[in-house]
Design a protein with these regions (language model features):
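Extended intrinsically disordered or low-complexity regions, especially N/C-terminal cytosolic tails and loops
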Residues: 1-106, 182-316
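Short, charged amphipathic alpha-helical segments flanked by flexible coils
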Residues: 108-124, 173-196
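A short mid-domain helix/strand-loop element embedded in enzyme catalytic domains
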Residues: 114-140
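Charged, low-complexity surface segments at secondary-structure and domain boundaries
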Residues: 141-142, 208
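Histidine-centered, metal-coordinating catalytic motifs and their short helical/loop contexts
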Residues: 149-182
Length: 316
């Protein structure tokens, strides 16, 4: 069974967030760009207001102060960028929770030795604080070597996220230190070659005690950086799961999630639902359905999955 390109449910959900988030950020930037064009063309605020009022429920109350619309647009871009960074980390931290829960679920089922004590998210912004991702790599007994080329950028965005969430977007000393870290410049120089991304992250200079002047580009850059780390963590967890653990998780997700996967309910049999999950949703390369079903029988899950599938179809 080739799991080299496979993903678990946690990874799939984060990937879908990343794609959806990128589209959303770009749509917001397009809207502000078109508004900036109107401002540059000298379109009166009243004309813009009348257009928006023509759309039902699109604008409520009066127009914002239009004395200096360029300043308002720049502020909106900053809010999009800052909110985007926080949103990216919210999805990423959820991914970490779900990924480790998947591994813990398999270890509990297989009576394997428990992992070390669970990590806990921290809001600290001290330079010496142990990062949550770093703690997870330690729990997995794994090296961060494969993400060493993105770590400095990750640290920058993690500290920026903390400043936005807990300091109203005011840069801390820790964020400034992350920005001027000697690793940043060489990391950005080799980013495209090492990661395969089309562009390197867009970082902005920060000053302690001043607002972090992010825009939509930093929101996208943060999400792209987190995706690279998520891919590596997903790979490590799949290695620890092995074939048996991966089959167990696919079956648990396909039949025992609440609410159940919509794709499961669309199938006409338990076997088809399981094979669809393995080959399509979780992307097992050159999937051999006979091999997957052998693992399912070896785990003593065939009857349980069949009974659960029948129950789900009755309730659908």
């Amino acid at each position: 069974m080739d799991l080299s390109g496979a993903n678990t449910e946690a990874m799939l959900r984060f990937h879908r967030f990343h794609e959806r988030f990128n589209r959303s950020i770009k749509v917001q930037a397009i809207g502000l760009g078109l508004l900036a064009d109107e401002v540059d063309a000298g379109t009166p605020a009243e004309t813009i207001r009348d257009r928006l009022y023509a759309r039902p429920d699109w604008l409520w109350g009066g127009m914002p102060d239009w004395t200096n619309p360029r300043v308002e647009i720049e502020g909106a871009l900053r809010d999009i960028g800052q909110a985007g960074v926080v949103r990216s980390f919210s999805a990423f931290d959820l991914f970490l929770d779900e990924l480790m829960a998947e591994l813990t679920s398999w270890r509990d089922f297989s009576s394997a030795t428990p992992l070390d004590a669970a990590d806990t998210p921290t809001n600290d912004d001290e330079p010496g604080d142990t990062d949550r991702v770093e703690r997870i790599y330690t729990r997995l007994g794994a090296s961060r070597a494969r993400i060493s080329d993105v770590w400095a950028v990750y640290a920058y965005f993690r500290r920026a996220r903390n400043c936005i969430a807990h300091r109203e977007g005011i840069a801390s000393r820790g964020l400034v230190e992350a920005y001027v870290a000697p690793e940043i410049a060489p990391t950005l120089d080799r980013w495209i070659v090492r990661t395969g991304d089309m562009t390197a992250p867009a970082l902005v200079a920060v000053q302690e005690g001043r607002q972090i002047a992010f825009s939509h580009r930093q929101g996208i850059s943060a999400s792209s950086t987190l995706r690279l780390i998520a891919i590596d963590l997903g790979r490590l967890v799949i290695e620890q799961l092995g074939e048996r653990g991966f089959v167990y998780l696919a079956a648990r997700r396909a039949f025992f999630d609440d609410p159940p996967l919509s794709a499961t309910l669309e199938m006409t049999s338990m076997v088809k639902a399981f094979n669809n999950a393995m080959a399509t949703r979780y992307r097992v390369r050159d999937y051999d359905f006979r091999e997957g079903l052998r693992f399912l029988r070896a785990l003593d899950l065939t009857k349980r999955c069949s009974a659960r599938f029948a129950e789900l179809k009755r309730r659908a």
